[in-house]
Amino acid sequence: MELWYTEEWTENVRFSIKVNKHLFEGKSQFQRIDVFDSDEFGKFLTIDGLMMVTYKDEFIYHEMITHVPMATNLNIKKVLVIGGGDGGTVRELSRYPQIEKIDMVEIDKMVVDVSKEYMDICSCKLDDKRVSLYFEDGVNFVKCAHDKSYDLIIVDSTDPIGPGEGLFSTDFYKDCYRILTDDGILVNQSESPYFDFNAKEMKRANKKLKQIFPISEVYQAHIPTYPSGHWLFGFASKKLNPVKNQDRNGWEKLSLKTKYYNSDIHLGSFMLPQYVKEMLDEE
């Protein structure tokens, strides 16, 4: 008998992966968490039936959400990660010696515990001495943080439903602005522009960021296991433009080995398809 994981992208579209084994299933006070093993994508973790991370393509998401802001400001020292319980974003941040402090705020401890056991490709740097883990609500953590206390905030959240909903609110973005330094950058995952539900949330988030931050841009990556494969990220800043202020030479001198991100991809990721540009221009 064959076992398949199937995720509903829309009422009319589903995405399936043939599964060898269902490695873990559990329910925290917030959400359902599952881990599967497959031939094509290796181990993968889902939350409430939605794909979060796979062994085969996780590097794309984690490199793009991390290296784009870092290559824009190589002087970043204090970083706040909201969500990111699998640890992949922290892993990429830990590669920068200039970073002194990484605070990771994950509402669901079970996500971290399960990732440590099954998704070690991502969670391998959560014990870095610069990393502090906080198991609490990210919205409240940001609200209580001191002014100008972080150089970079990465919102590595689930979709804007359930526990992740508040991380797409105007009040949350205003608090992020307040706790960022003058050269501070906020990056978030911004859903897909392709299917209507994802596109609606993407437009809402982008509109809110534009109202709060002087610089607000959108960039993209191809992530095969996310709905449509076309995924967007938001980049918001008080001063720094990710294209004009890209420190290509400085970043390349670090000689970081990557699988997806490079200096050309950095620039190219901001060159959006026409239909996405038009969506973002809609009031």
Swiss-Prot record:
Residues given in the record as spermidine binding sites: 62, 86, 156-159
Gene: speE
PANTHER family the UniProt entry points to: SPERMIDINE SYNTHASE, SPERMIDINE/SPERMINE SYNTHASE
Name of the protein: Polyamine aminopropyltransferase
A GO-annotated cellular component: cytosol
EC number: 2.5.1.16
Subcellular location: Cytoplasm
Pathway: Amine and polyamine biosynthesis; spermidine biosynthesis; spermidine from putrescine: step 1/1
Domain PABS: 2-238
Organism: Clostridioides difficile (strain 630) (Peptoclostridium difficile)
Keyword Isomerase in annotation: no
Coiled coil regions in record: none
Keywords: Cytoplasm, Polyamine biosynthesis, Spermidine biosynthesis, Transferase
Binding site residues for S-methyl-5'-thioadenosine: 31, 106, 137-138, 163
Example GO BP: spermidine biosynthetic process
Top-level division of the source organism's lineage: Bacteria
Catalytic activity as recorded in UniProt: S-adenosyl 3-(methylsulfanyl)propylamine + putrescine = S-methyl-5'-thioadenosine + spermidine + H(+)
Main EC class the enzyme belongs to: transferase
Active site: 156
